[in-house]
Amino acid sequence: MVVDDKYDPHSVEREAQLFWENNQTFSVNECSEKEKFYCLAMFPYPSGKLHMGHVRNYTIADVIARYQRMLGKNVLQPMGWDAFGLPAENAAIENNTEPSEWTKKNIQTMKSQLKSLGLAIDWSREFATCEPSYFKWEQWFFTRLFEKNLVYKKASAVNWCPSCETVLANEQVIDTSCWRCDSVVEKKNIPQWFIKITKYADELLSGLEDLEHWPDQVKTMQRNWIGKSRGINITFNVKDKEFNHHQLEVYTTRPDTLMGVTYLALAPEHPLTSDLSKKNNDIAKFVKRCSRQKVSEEEFATVSKIGIDTGLKAIHPLTNDLLPIWVGNYVLIDYGSGAVMAVPGHDQRDFEFAKKYNLKIKQVVSLDKKDTSINEKAIIEKGNLINSGKYNDLTFNEAFSAIAEDLKKLNQGEVTSNYRLRDWGVSRQRYWGAPIPMFNLLSGGEIPIPYDRLPVSLDKQKFNKGERNNKTQEFNGRQVIQETDTFDTFMESSWYHARFTCSNDTSQMIDPVKANYWLPVDQYIGGIEHAILHLLYARFFHKLMRDEGLLNSDEPFKKLLCQGMVLSESYFYEKNGKKIWVSPSEVEFHRNENGKLTKITQINSDVELSSGGVTKMSKSKNNGIDPQVIIDNYGADTVRLFTMFAAPPEQTMEWSEQGVAGAFKFLKRLWKITYDQAVVNFPKEEIDKAKLNQQQLDLRRKTHETIAKVTDDYSRRNTFNTAIAAVMELLNEVTKIRPLCASSSIVRREAIINSILMLYPVVPHICIKLWEMLDNEVPISEASWPEVDESALQKSFVTIVIQVNGKVRGRIEVGIGEDDAAVKHKAIRQENVSRFIENREIKKIIFVPNKLINIVVSM
């Protein structure tokens, strides 16, 4: 074939991508005769542009998918769009458009960019989660969960802007104010929908043990999030004429500190607090003040602790001491019962609160069985009990058992398990989301919207007018109002992996036959920032679908790879006390005649810049690199090669213009090496090993050593950077042997062909052309992964270590199986060795074949 001796990435990539599209190369169906492999990268939110994080994520997935395809497996790699969410709604408002139009336009742009990367994607399965054909089945499934009593509605705290009359996400609350209008944000209880994930807490916890190919860090994060603990529910009676009917339930994992309780603290939302607020104006004002806090657990952990004394007393269940009851802003209503037994001596939050309000601090646990003054901080470690009456000297476990038994006898305590995990609140007071398919009855209660009315679609008019559909209507003779909340977007991303197995099925949510063929996903790729919410919800949803009979696997993802962040240099200047971040593409470096950097400025400006260091690429620091610019300049294969070569996938990757240029230089060299081989006129022949000289045998051995290493790097270790480095080393050896004869040409060709095959998953476009250049009979897209020829690994020579009186004095190369006498003779004559045995008597020579010789001489 006629080929150019110069590498033109753009023409090569256009041709390859057109071939894949026209031939639907990566469209797959179920095939019982082939082993399946389902490779899935977390699908993107259509923000409008790919960033380098996307490129890295999808390139890693594509390399794995292409490699598995070369192993002969039936490989599915789909792509879709996580299209609902607040950013689209806000962008639509700012741009005076409709979220669906804004999203559709972004999808078109990003799809084109993904295609330009040359990803081996089955585009026939593509969907966006904002399409009614997708969320219809999500709505249907929610109604099934409602019928199975796995869904309920209750009032829950949210961030509320009274001016905008809307709920705000935690990130939209800035210094206690609304990000949009600066009004003071309040905490408000509104009815919201929940799914009972806590029913599956034990299975979600135990299932982590079966996820052998998940990072330990992710599994630890999920264990901590589920947070199973063993403790005691303790009942404290309230001593008050008006409220003596109240009993306060408290859950504690540290019953050994019960004798150190000096007060009780209630959450501002606790029922007793609500009752007191109606009668006590000071408490009502305090609760109102607390309502301005954010509602996230992280905020509670760092909030400045404030409280108010209710004037009520609780009775200690073992000592009958009277304990003051306070309301504290640091108590979470959603953990335990919303009340805590405060032990300032042994809990840091209680300690800080007690110090602030001069409450009693009592030490009841000691690490050395001594009573020490607690002034600086609480003693949170477990030890032996002191100041605890009959429980003195007991260890934690002994005290747990003894106190639990005594409380049980008094009918004031019971051993139980508790979870940090809370039921999943799926309501969002937003327009751009999947509508929750429920009717609220005017008479009270809720009923699901029936299947024949699904999907419940979004009303564009309501968005344009900013209205919520809360008109009364009649359904089956009952007055109802359609639910106006939409689903949390984590709902859509919790089951998309299963829908990809049958995305064009209009008759059912999941086709069990197809789902059971493809699932679980064999390799899932995404950032570790999704370790808790997305990955936990996806595991939960998978089990819900299993219990509905839609699929039969227990877990959604067999193997999980969390790719590292992409880093880049950052630059800024200060203006009015604020840092103004400048894109690296707008930075100019000034050097003196010796090449030393003297200053950094913004291009076409005298403004001097400071370095912000190497940080994660982000909009906030304006240090992102537009991958499309790099593709336009160098081609997609260069971007892919740099991305995979710069670092192992789990580690952070630092962007480098020099690295990109180096990747492009290597591809040009690969093209030149292959071209030189292609123009040689020697006929293609089988290798006759008997005719090969030592240099040719060495190249064959290097070729098959490289195949063995790269196969291990791809399949077991996922260290693609070292695999690429190994191929580069092999090609260096190729250039040392010229195709001056048939035998040299044959072993060079073998090395080059195998190099192309091993690089194909990483740089597929150029490899297609190089493969054709060498006149191979089958397309590379149908070629198998290269196999190691074990016979080629056998060395004809071996290096022998020579010792004199046990000390290493030299090395020689000898033929494998060479005569012992000849080897000993060579050893004695070795230049350095001869100096140490000169004029000495050789008493004996110890010879370990193919390893070492030890010459023992007189001293």
Where are these predicted regions, by residue range?
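N-terminal catalytic cores of NTP/NDP-binding nucleotidyl/phosphoryl-transfer enzymes
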Residues: V28-T97, E126-F141, T252-T253, P317-F353, ...
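Acidic, turn-prone loop/beta-hairpin segments
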Residues: D82, M438-L442, E446-Y451, L560, ...
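NTP-handling and nucleic-acid-processing catalytic cores
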Residues: V2-L18, E138-I361, S366, F475, ...
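Long, charged, mostly alpha-helical binding arms that flank functional sites
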Residues: V3-D5, S229-N233, S366-K369, S373-T416, ...
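Basic, alpha-helical terminal appendages of large translation-related enzymes
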Residues: M1-K36, A267-H270, N280, G311, ...
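Residue patterns forming the tRNA-binding/recognition surfaces of aminoacyl-tRNA synthetases
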Residues: E15, F19-N23, E94-L248, P255-D256, ...
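Flexible, glycine/threonine-enriched loop-and-boundary segments that flank and lead into catalytic domains
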Residues: Q217-E249, K294-D321, I325, W424, ...
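Conserved oxyanion/phosphate-binding beta-strand-loop segments in alpha/beta enzyme cores
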Residues: M1-L40, R69-P78, E101-K111, H213, ...
